[in-house]
Amino acid sequence: MLETRWHLIRHAPVDNPEGRIYGSSDKSANTSNANAFQLLAQRLPREGIAITSHLKRTQQTLDALISGGLEVSQQIIENRLGEQDFGDWTGKTYEEVRSLFGDAYDKFWITPAKEKPPNGENFIQVIDRVRECILDCTKKFKGRDVICISHGGVIRAALTIALKIEAERALSISVDNLSTTIIDYLHPCENFAGTWRVRCTNVPAI
C-alpha cells in the first residue's frame, strides 16, 4: 500500500518575553540549541521533500536542521502554511487586547475556532487553506516523505483533517516548538478508498 508521510514540525522558539501575539508576523526563530537540531535531524528521513511557510522562522528552523545533518531533496515555500493572522491583535499582549477590544476579545474565547480577530482570520479559514495545500502536496509527492516545518495552528489544522475532528477540539491539542507530529495518507487501491493515519503527536526534539 502506497503511503505519503507528513512529518510536521513546529518552528524553533521565538524570543517573546512579553508574551505578545505574533501570529502571521515575520518573527525570527531562536536556533541556538544546536543539540536539539542535531537530535531531531537524526530522526527525520533522508532525502525528503522539505516544505516551509513563507515566514522566516520556519525557514531558519529548516536551515538549522540542515546544519544539524538533515538531508533533503527539495525545498519548497508554501504561503498556505502560514500561521493564523490575528489582524489588529498582532503585536499586542493579551492584556492589551482585552483592554482595547473588550467584548470582542471575550466573544472570541467562547468559540475561538469560529470567531475572527478584527482584520484577521479565524481557525476555520486556516483549516481550509491548510487542507487545500496538504491535499495538493500529497498528490504531487505521492509515496514520499514530506518534512513540513510550519506553525502550531497549521499542525492543529492538519490534525483536524487526519482525525476528522471538529476545529474546536483541535485547539486543545498541544504543539510545542520543535515537536514532531506524523500523519500518513494511505493512498486508494483496489477495494480501499484511502485514509489518513496519525502516528504520533507533539514528540519533543529532546
What spans do the regions from the language model cover?
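Active-site-proximal alpha-helix that buttresses catalytic centers in soluble enzyme cores
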Residues: 4-70
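Acidic, low-complexity terminal tails and accessory targeting/binding regions
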Residues: 1-5, 84-99, 139-144, 160-206
